[in-house]
């Protein structure tokens, strides 16, 4: 698989001001209020009356912002550090990404509590649909013209908007819960699918359509996930994905945990990603704190992150092949994952959820003998991947079930916010480790695997090749592990190095305060995205100068990937949907947070 040069991706330039010049030339500098942040991109506030015009301009400009990367809200009412910003009770931000520019821009709009209305942008970016629904669900902000503004994370019967600051964050602040028979029947009835509410017909010209629930408890749904299918025989006429069954309020939890104590919660976002989940969070916090970690920390973090990329991809490979009917490989891939977890456990002390990265470093140094364990694994895995390729991936039945199935092109992928292997399988050479290196990835030699058909088979093959590249990266970590400390010498490193606590009373006090109350981060905003196991994962943090986050926005790759399903699978067979779901590689914790 070789690189596709159809889209040239220039070197990354943080805080790229070119778009600001273009916007000022088009609308005038007075139309915007620039906000200084540590997000690495221009952040501009606009008036609501000009919002849609500005966004349309960015979508159609030369080298356009083809991807609506994220869209969400903030309850600004309790925020104290807002000097220089427009008055706002609530705000909504639009994070736009341009592949052709390799740069981002964030547009914000302020709203007053008595007038929480915005125009929908679903006509500009189709993936705005779910994001706008979630903003309404969590904050109660209306989007005029939205095709189906309804609950998406919370049940249809839910009352209130959970991410508002006046909404309780603890169960003890609610009345005791009781489930009466009448309430149970109400909840069950609320889940009944109404085709007319979604613009679907019950009959065609010569046929009656059948409506089938796939999930929320179905092995091929890969979690608590429901898709309602409109069927003409075996053909999918239309479908409606239904998410939220796995929602745990991760972003709300972040407002009640210290910067340090939230780290274990990040492990549970993509629960197969392990420390890969910690990485964007601690990098974003380190931007707030102004911490520069030692080189050894970067290399250790990369090595462990790539181990979890391999374990996640091995699980994907086994279940993907199983979804299309082959039973044996999944037992082998799970056994192979155990060998990786043996190494991970020896280094971190844990297996699936180590919560091992720290603000300013990692939990502890590499143990004695780590290098032999890593070396043995690096030498062993490539031969296993060769066996999988020969025995399973070249199988004619698997190819027949997946080649040409659920295919989409680069343009469609960008419009729906698709990242990771799903984007690179269309030939788009965009991998953050190369395009926007972080944690020292620019010092490693590896290739970005690509395919060109964008179908279910290509998505699988890209991930298999990614495992080979992860082995290359881990091998370079093994051969070039620097000497030095495993934590940064910085006042906000948490926990601080403990060796000095027995010698300096000030260090002991700092250690106690940072572990109990948590470190105090400067008031600002920061942002970090990484190339995670399932696509681009990012944390957008807002600090109000306290020990806890004022607002934590977690953007996960699986969320837009599931929203894309209807546009890809219409007109296909039910069996093709099963292959498509397997090829996406998602877990519902990553979708629902």
From Swiss-Prot:
Membrane topology summary: Peripheral membrane protein
Single GO MF annotation: NADH dehydrogenase (ubiquinone) activity
A GO CC term attached to the entry: NADH dehydrogenase complex
UniProt region (NADH dehydrogenase I subunit C), positions on chain: 1-184
Chain spans, region NADH dehydrogenase I subunit D: 208-593
Coiled coil location: none
EC numbers: 7.1.1.-
Alphabetical UniProt keywords: Cell inner membrane, Cell membrane, Membrane, Multifunctional enzyme, NAD, Quinone, Translocase, Transport, Ubiquinone
Protein location: Cell inner membrane
Reactions this protein catalyses: a quinone + NADH + 5 H(+)(in) = a quinol + NAD(+) + 4 H(+)(out)
NCBIfam families referenced in this protein's UniProt entry, alphabetically: NuoC_fam, NuoD, PRK06075.1, PRK11742.1
Annotated function: NDH-1 shuttles electrons from NADH, via FMN and iron-sulfur (Fe-S) centers, to quinones in the respiratory chain. The immediate electron acceptor for the enzyme in this species is believed to be ubiquinone. Couples the redox reaction to proton translocation (for every two electrons transferred, four hydrogen ions are translocated across the cytoplasmic membrane), and thus conserves the redox energy in a proton gradient.
Family to which the UniProt record says this protein belongs: In the N-terminal section; belongs to the complex I 30 kDa subunit family.
Self-association and partners: NDH-1 is composed of 13 different subunits. Subunits NuoB, CD, E, F, and G constitute the peripheral sector of the complex.
Protein name: NADH-quinone oxidoreductase subunit C/D
The species this protein was found in: Pseudomonas putida (strain ATCC 700007 / DSM 6899 / JCM 31910 / BCRC 17059 / LMG 24140 / F1)
């Amino acid at each position: 698989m070789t690189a596709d040069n159809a889209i040239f991706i220039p070197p990354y330039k943080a805080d790229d001001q070119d778009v600001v010049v273009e916007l000022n030339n088009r609308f005038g500098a007075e139309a915007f209020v620039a906000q200084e942040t540590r997000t690495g991109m221009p952040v501009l506030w606009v008036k609501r009356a000009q919002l849609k015009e500005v966004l349309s301009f960015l979508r159609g400009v030369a080298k356009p912002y083809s991807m609506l990367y994220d869209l969400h809200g903030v309850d600004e009412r309790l925020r104290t550090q807002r000097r220089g910003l427009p008055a706002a009770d609530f705000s909504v931000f639009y994070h736009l990404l341009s592949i052709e520019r390799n740069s981002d821009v964030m547009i914000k709009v302020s709203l007053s509590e008595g007038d929480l209305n915005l125009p929908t942008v679903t006509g500009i970016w189709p993936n705005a649909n779910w994001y706008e629904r979630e903003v309404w669900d969590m904050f109660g902000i209306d989007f005029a013209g939205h095709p189906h503004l309804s609950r998406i994370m919370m049940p249809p019967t839910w009352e209130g908007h959970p991410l508002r600051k006046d909404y309780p964050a603890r169960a003890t602040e609610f009345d005791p819960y009781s489930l009466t028979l009448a309430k149970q029947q109400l909840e069950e009835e609320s889940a009944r699918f109404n085709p007319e509410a979604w613009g679907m017909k019950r009959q065609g010209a010569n046929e009656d359509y059948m409506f089938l629930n796939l999930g929320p408890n179905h092995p091929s749904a890969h979690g608590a996930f429901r898709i309602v299918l409109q069927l003409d025989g075996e053909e999918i006429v239309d479908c409606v994905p239904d998410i939220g069954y796995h929602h745990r309020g991760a972003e709300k939890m972040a407002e009640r945990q210290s910067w340090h104590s939230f780290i274990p919660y990040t492990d549970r976002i993509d629960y197969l990603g392990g420390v890969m989940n910690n990485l964007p969070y601690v990098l974003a916090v380190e931007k707030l704190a102004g911490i520069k970690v030692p080189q050894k920390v970067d290399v250790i973090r990369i090595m462990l992150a790539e181990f979890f990329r391999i374990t996640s991809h091995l699980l994907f490979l086994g279940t993907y092949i199983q979804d299309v009917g082959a039973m044996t490989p999944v037992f082998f891939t799970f056994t192979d994952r155990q060998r990786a977890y043996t190494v991970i456990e020896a280094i971190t002390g844990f297996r699936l959820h180590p919560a091992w990265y720290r603000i300013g470093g990692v939990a502890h140094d590499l143990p004695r003998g780590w290098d032999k364990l890593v070396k043995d694994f690096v030498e062993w895995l490539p031969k296993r991947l060769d066996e999988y390729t020969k025995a399973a991936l070249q199988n004619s039945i698997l190819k027949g079930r997946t080649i040409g199935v659920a295919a989409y092109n680069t343009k469609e992928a960008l419009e729906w916010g698709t990242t990771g292997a799903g984007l690179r399988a269309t030939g788009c050479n965009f991998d953050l480790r190369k395009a926007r290196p972080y944690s020292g990835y620019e010092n490693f030699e590896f290739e970005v695997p690509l395919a060109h058909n964008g179908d279910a088979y290509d998505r699988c093959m890209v991930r298999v090749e990614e495992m080979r590249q992860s082995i290359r990266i881990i091998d370079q970590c093994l051969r070039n592990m620097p000497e030095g400390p495993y934590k940064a010498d910085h006042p906000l490193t948490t926990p601080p190095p403990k060796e000095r606590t027995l010698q300096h009373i000030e260090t002991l006090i700092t250690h106690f305060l940072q572990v109990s109350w948590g470190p105090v981060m400067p008031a600002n905003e920061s942002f970090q995205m990484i190339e995670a196991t399932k696509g681009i994962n990012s944390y957008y943090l807002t600090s109000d100068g306290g020990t806890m986050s004022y607002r934590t926005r977690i953007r996960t790759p699986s969320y837009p990937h599931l929203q894309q399903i209807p546009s890809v699978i219409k007109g296909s067979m039910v069996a093709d949907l099963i292959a498509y779901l397997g090829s996406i590689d998602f877990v519902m914790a990553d979708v629902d947070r």
